[in-house]
């Protein structure tokens, strides 16, 4: 029963779209600004770096807190961790409180990975930073870091439930970036 409550908690916490909440408090409708996304990147474009960093941190915590509880309560090799991590990211992408229209899940996924392995999260962030500084595309950096996280977890020998979680979350993140991928391939993606 505790496991079920944790998964539900993870989804509901993930469903709090902090970008949208903060933007509304500032009188901005993110759906009508920039990319229309509710994540940290669009918040940065619409409200500035201070609010973008705040949203990134809050979205990160949405993944980190439930995943850390799962790791501490059930162990890293427990499928409870897998479903908790997935629920956090799915909540962010498809939030019940905001008409199932959320963000792309990158910061929330990073929080999940950090709860599993701070070193893998750090390496993935460094990959993101390197690609971003080189190409100035947030989407390309996010996709590359997502793939890198799975590879780092695989090489480090993490259990199958963690690898499964990383594959599913990675596939969801790439799917949520499908329009960005199309724009990257056609040279129409916006640089940051």
From Swiss-Prot:
One of its GO terms (cellular component) is plasma membrane. The chain crosses the membrane at residues 3-23, 51-71, 80-100, 112-132, 149-169. SMART domains: G3P_acyltransf. GO terms for biological process: phospholipid biosynthetic process. Keywords: Cell inner membrane, Cell membrane, Lipid biosynthesis, Lipid metabolism, Membrane, Phospholipid biosynthesis, Phospholipid metabolism, Transferase, Transmembrane, Transmembrane helix. Its EC number is 2.3.1.275. Probably interacts with PlsX. Catalyzes the transfer of an acyl group from acyl-phosphate (acyl-PO(4)) to glycerol-3-phosphate (G3P) to form lysophosphatidic acid (LPA). This enzyme utilizes acyl-phosphate as fatty acyl donor, but not acyl-CoA or acyl-ACP. This is Glycerol-3-phosphate acyltransferase. It comes from Aquifex aeolicus (strain VF5). The lineage of its organism: Bacteria, Pseudomonadati, Aquificota, Aquificia, Aquificales.
């Amino acid at each position: 029963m505790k496991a079920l409550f944790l998964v539900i908690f993870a989804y509901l916490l993930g469903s709090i779209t902090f970008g949208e909440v903060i933007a509304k408090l500032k009188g901005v409708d993110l759906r009508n600004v920039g990319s229309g996304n509710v994540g940290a990147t669009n918040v940065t474009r619409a409200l500035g770096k201070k609010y973008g960093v705040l949203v990134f941190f809050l979205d990160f915590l949405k993944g980190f807190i439930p995943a850390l509880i799962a790791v501490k309560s059930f162990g890293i090799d427990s499928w409870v961790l897998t479903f908790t991590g997935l629920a956090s990211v799915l909540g962010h992408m498809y939030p019940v409180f905001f008409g199932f229209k959320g963000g792309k899940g990158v910061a929330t996924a990073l929080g999940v990975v950090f709860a599993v392995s701070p070193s893998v999260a750090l390496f993935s962030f460094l990959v993101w930073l390197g690609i971003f500084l080189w190409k100035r595309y947030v989407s390309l950096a996010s996709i590359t870091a997502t793939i890198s996280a799975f590879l780092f977890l695989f090489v480090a020998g993490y259990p199958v439930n963690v690898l499964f979680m990383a594959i599913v979350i990675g596939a969801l993140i790439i799917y949520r970036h499908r329009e960005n991928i199309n724009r990257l391939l056609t040279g129409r993606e916006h640089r940051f």
